[in-house]
Amino acid sequence: MKIIAVTGYKPFELGIFKQDEPALQYIKAELQKRLTALIEDGLEWVLISGQLGAEIWTAEVVFELQEEYPALKLAVITPFYDQEERWNEQNKELYEGILAQADFVESVTHRPYESPAQFKQKNRFFIEKTDGLLALYDPEHDGSPKYMIKEAENYTDYPIMYITMDDLRAQVEAEDPFFDEKQEKI
């Protein structure tokens, strides 16, 4: 796979409300592990739409990985112009920083938000232009990524790689073998 799309939960869907939330280190570590394996198999481009949560965290991981793998590129292709318009200032700053560092920035529809159809267009575009999808999503825990995943499932031979809650738990346990004992004391 040379080009992958990445999608996943928004921060509030995971109960994450701050950039310094401890859970983020484990999410980013799992993203880094998955992306590194794909890079070593020939990954060149990561596509995100710039949504808060898994996509922004992926961008941050890509920027870190570019230090070791400078050929890796990030594209931010939004569903419409000004998607950050209603975000708070902190999220806007984070988003604008991602756009400034991205290797390619574009919009699918070249106009402001008009209807949910623009999200469908974005999903279709991403799947048609990529070789696979990496999703921070657990089918047992519903959330916003389900729309992109449902679209991807309509395509024959389009690989979907999941990062599930079990994967994240394994990442936590790998980094902190005493995690379960600490949880029991709480």
Curated annotation (Swiss-Prot):
It holds the Pfam family YpsA. InterPro entries: YspA. It comes from the Bacteria. Belongs to the UPF0398 family. This is UPF0398 protein BPUM_1952. It comes from Bacillus pumilus (strain SAFR-032).
